[in-house]
Swiss-Prot record:
GO cellular component: cytoplasm; nucleoplasm; nucleus; photoreceptor inner segment
Matching InterPro entries: HATC_C_dom (IPR008906), RNaseH-like_sf (IPR012337), Znf_BED (IPR003656), ZnF_BED_domain_contain (IPR052035), Znf_C2H2_sf (IPR036236)
A Gene Ontology biological process term: positive regulation of transcription by RNA polymerase II
Source organism: Mus musculus
Binding locations of Zn(2+) 4: C578, C581, H602, H607
Gene from which the chain derives: Zbed4
Basic and acidic residues bias locations: 37-52
Protein name, as recorded: Zinc finger BED domain-containing protein 4
Intracellular or extracellular location(s): Cytoplasm; Nucleus; Photoreceptor inner segment
Zn finger (BED-type) start-end: 114-171, 284-341, 456-512, 557-614
Gene Ontology molecular-function annotations: DNA-binding transcription activator activity, RNA polymerase II-specific; identical protein binding; protein dimerization activity; RNA binding; RNA polymerase II transcription regulatory region sequence-specific DNA binding; transcription cis-regulatory region binding; zinc ion binding
Function: Transcriptional regulator that binds to poly-guanine tracts in gene promoters and activates transcription. Able to bind single- and double-stranded DNA and RNA.
Amino acid sequence: MEDKQETCPKGDSDFVSDKVNFKTEEDDDQTPCHSLEQVDFKSESEDMRQTDSGDEQADIRAASCACQPSGKFLAAESEDDYGSLFSQYSSTLYSVAMEAVTQSLLSSRHISSRKKSPAWKHFFISPRDSTKAICTYCMKEFSRGKNEKDLSTSCLMRHVRRAHPTKLIQENGSLSAGSSFSPPSLLLPPQPADVGDLSTVLSPVRLVQKMAPKIPSPDQIMEESVTVVSSEELSSDVSVTEKYSREEALAGSSPNLSMLHYDDASETMADRNLSLPKSTSGSRRRSAVWKHFYLSPLDSSKAVCVHCMNEFSRGKNGKDLGTSCLIRHMWRAHRSIVLQENGGNTGIPPLYPMPPTLLPALLPPEGDLNSASLSPGKQVKESPSASSSPERLPEDLSSHTNPGDVSREDVSMLSSSDDLGEASVVSSPEKQPADTVNPRFESGTVFQQNKKVMRRLKSEVWHHFSLAPMDSLKAVCRYCSCVISRGKKGDVGTSCLMRHLYRRHPEVVGNQKDFLGASLANSPYATLASAESSSKLTDLPAVVRKNHQGVFPTNSKKTSKLWNHFSICSADSTKVVCLHCGRTISRGKKPTNLGTSCLLRHLQRFHGHVLKNDVSEATLSRSPGIRRPLGIELSGPSSFRDSTEKFYDSHPVAKKITSLIAEMIALDLQPYSLVDNVGFNRLLEYLKPQYSLPSPSYFSRTAIPGMYDNVKQIIMSHLKEAESGVVHFTSGIWMSSQTREYLTLTAHWVTFASAVRPHCEDHHCSALLDVSQIDCDYSGNSIQKQLECWWEAWVTSIGLQIGITVTDNPSIGKMLSEGEHSSVQCFSHTVNLIVSEAIKSQRMVQNLLSIARKLCERVHRSPRAREKLAELQKEYELPQHQLIQDVPSKWSTSFHMLERLIEQKRAVNEVSIECNFRELISCDQWEVMQSVCHVLRPFDAASREMSAHMSTLSQVIPMIHILSRKVEMLFGETMGIDTMLKSLKEAMASRLSATLHDPRYIFATLLDPRYKASLFTEEEAEQYRQDLIRELEILNSTSEDTATSNGCDSGSPLKDTGTEESLWSLAPIKRDQREKLPEDMVLAYLEEEVLEHSCDPLTYWNLKRSSWPGLSTLAVRFLGCPPSTVPSEKLFSTPMDAGSFGQPRLMMEHFEKLIFLKVNLPLICFQY
């Protein structure tokens, strides 16, 4: 085979051709009508080949130049056909490679030093890099060495021995059978009887590569292709009979050249093409899955699904490609297609005898069929392998069908098929019947064929759904009219639709035949099917038929019986809520990897009796002779999803729904008669038909009182965790819209390590303890008795101490001071009094507020003014805000009203003029308004700062200093409001001077690491430091007395329980009797740097508990008290303004419990 090579110029056309020998044999064992004609191509291209005999050269010239049929050589028309065939490759992914291969072979004919090895019969030099070679069988590139001076063919031969061993066997056989002058031809093995045999075939790429040396140049190929195609276009008006006669004559001129016959589904006629001989080299694209995929025209390592047109990778590199991803995609996304094609047969369909072609068929643009004459894609007429469907066309589609006879119904397909018009599609060439005649068909017919096959492969789920008219990515259920998304653009499927059927309409699924039968056992999807079925057996009862053993494939994640006891948390999908105790349990950290192990452990630990009931029911369901409805089997033995049986009262789902309804009554302060409302009952009947709603008396006598007792016990357990054993309070008198007055008491404490709230970074805790109605003519004694009663029930009875009580009512504060209870005034209430006095002190400011108030009221009442204001806001690009109407008794609302008017100044002026308002704001008034806002802004910020949840008493003194300095600065920054500023200064001095010298505020400020002694003078700092040391000594003495009373005497000797004399008593023990003195702790604390204002002081003292335990306890006593009652007032502001506490709606004896639940349920995170 390495002998000689012949260079044979071709007359005038300069066509260089090697010897091409075609030897065809027919398989006599096959039926004459279905005989498979086979062709063997053998080509040899050696650089230094000696000249053959003159007769042989003459024959080659006659075959290549004169184009006359001669024996075993190719005819001219056949050569033109091959030119047209090869022209298809020039515009595809492989066209560049093929042209480069041709040029490389033609240009390197006279180079004899590098291609003497037998490896060059299977490789050619890469046109991009001369140190690399490309395999002619698999088109993979291999390196021959690092530099051009040291090149070898060891890697090349190794690749041939490993990847293509049969090529070497064929080569050796041909050497023994023939001579060097007469190239031998390989005899094709007989066609096996089993069509599904996995015998290997010769790839079309090899065909192209073996014939590449016969290609003169890409330009000549294109010219010949144009000639052939143009002649076909011009003769389009010729009758079909004449076309057949011409083809038969051409076939008769070269009887030894056999052709493949393919089934034409659109015209039931055949097209001729060259047959590819079988090989034993082992093609990688022979799997049955290639009926549903074709190779991507842009990347040969990827495949495109013909159903959803999605692209999938077959491997990371070109050396390790497979079909596992393709099989997995078909099983997950198009399972119904797989089951449909395997459901009626005893095995998988026969595999392809040939791999799919690597090149796509290029469809011409619509309406311009002639434009394809210059495109290699026109070759689509020659081979049905260019069809967009990889599956063998069914016999029922082989009737005479013309492109114009395609019905409009064929166009309305799955929405995924709408994207096929733009895609270049390739099928897997399958063996077709050989007794049919194959005329050339138009590209439009191919596209219509594709649509017909696509519709036949349409998923069965579309019998139950229809595409949404407004959005093609969604489908509408035919039973419940629900709109379900099919995925994102470019990645649509039917998984969500199947899941909807299994969850909402299992009875429809039950009426269908088994989707997974025994016929799927031998298919590529058997592994996936068996794995999925085995994973479902533990959670889903098997639905077994007489003749089929399998389960319904379901994608639902809630098939486990555990979901009868849990529901997915609405706030976080990775967590679930137990229907028995209401606890939140995590299912995993990653949303893509969630499980039910934690759910099972929770039931085993806290609700073991529930699992026992499930086991007994499961045993009953598995008893012979008992058949359960399909819906109950699919959703678990304890599920009542599709059953008409009502829940019993102790059922976990019924108990959870009843508890949620009771929560709704408490949180929204709804009357108990809500459960009798028709609309509410209809809603529950639709959401959960198996649930029976209890009567109103059940909620008023059982549900709400029981919930109140549970929440009260939880609040008590929280109070026991208070640090330093001190609880602070806020108390006040709250008036409802019914002119009823209520006394409230709210507790505030600090918790560092809570067993109820683990991993909680917020150390500030609060809870509403009680609410009680009082008479309008209440006295201080009655309030004191009520508070003493509450403190005894909530605080002193569990060993806690009563701390500081913050109130905005002067009478309550006076009463507490007389009763030896520590109390302070609400800072926010004091600021309100100061600002209100300052506003009333200057008449001009009052007149300005009156004008602004009337102007805003007119705009709110006039639709014309509102529309004009909106137009001017758009014209002047102002914020689209409405004007604010203030409440005269609340200065903060007046401040926000003035700020909004200044923001909309330009629009407000024009609206006032165009709408003829009597209230017009002058330029001087606008300036005064800005000055008033400038003064009120720091006081508004101070009120909001001190009303925050984490604010403490330590912030009061720093805030007073800040406001005093700001007022001094405002005298030079404002105009026209000096009287107001003087009133502010005097009111602050009279109302806040006592606070600056209050030891409780001073200690709180010193113990706050953000301030310490930075706000005091040196004399004051030294005095307050000594006071703090004495306070700490008093606290230590109290704690030592408590420790001695508990029996923890440090001086008592240690005694061994085992013997009277302990050996350890002989060891010398040295104890450090020197403990940290209060003075040392205080000095060490004050010497540290001051922290930033954003830091939490309680977090700081939590870290210092081990270093300074006594000082940390003292700090918690003062820093745990809030400076304002506003946080407590916010809990009652909404119902008071809504005016929903009418006597007909709520019974007064129940109102106290409802308001208690309304406030505390969110505070304990509904864990009761």
